[in-house]
Amino acid sequence: MNFTLHTLNGIKLWLVLLLLSGAINVCRADSPRQTINFNRGWKYCQGDFDHAARPGFDDSEWEKIGLPHSFSTPYFMSKDFYVGYGWYRKAFPVKKEILGKKSFLEFDGVFQEAEIFVNGHLAGTHKGGYTGFSIDISAYLKEGKNLVAVRVNNCWRPDLAPRAGEHVFSGGIYRNVRLVIKPPTYIDWYGTWITTPDLAENKGKSGSVHIRTDVCNASGKTDTYRLLTTVVDAQGKERSE
């Protein structure tokens, strides 16, 4: 094995270049990361509304929905489709022990512009309906009841592509959403890159696995950590780490 030393945010990382072929497991079973399905318990209303991001806003008449969701539901047989804004709201509890950790909302897809509010505060935005994104909501959470509100629009923009042809570009949170809770030192969103540069040259018989991982340190402390990546074969048996 070869070891390469990197420094990122005050953390020393040993990134292992594993000289074995096989599948790569980058998340161990005992990982401190929690992933919570965030698809249930939403409310939705078509249109744009002042103060809909505020926790005290009256959404009692809004439609109760689950995700994934589309602006066109239940009008998918209509010849026309709605272009404009829609709001989503969801209340959820937070325990005290979560507040010292990092919490992210991970969206697999929102068409096509999204503004994410937590307890009335703008936590982040995203443009583009085909790519996932992660929003850090840690600073806006409180113990007890919390409120996330998402303002979405599917208005035409010349700088957001592709949008042409006969396909219907309905708006909405049309893919899954997760609440991901991580320790203060954590692997970033899509923070692991894996390549096998000589696998084709060796015709799949053997190859080196190159791994790069970005680790973020939000603890405010400088320390030394050991980053462990495990290689398993097709049957799930550990081959190296």
Regions found by a protein language model. Give the residues of each.
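Accessory carbohydrate-binding/adhesion or oligomerization-edge regions at the termini
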Residues: 14, 25-79, 147, 151-157, ...
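Accessory beta-strand-rich segments of carbohydrate-active enzymes
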Residues: 36, 48, 70, 83-189, ...
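Short flexible loop/turn segments that cap and initiate beta-strands
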Residues: 55-57, 222-228
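Active-site region of glycoside hydrolase catalytic domains
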Residues: 188-190, 208-210, 225-227
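Short, solvent-exposed loop/linker segments at the N-terminal edge
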Residues: 196-207
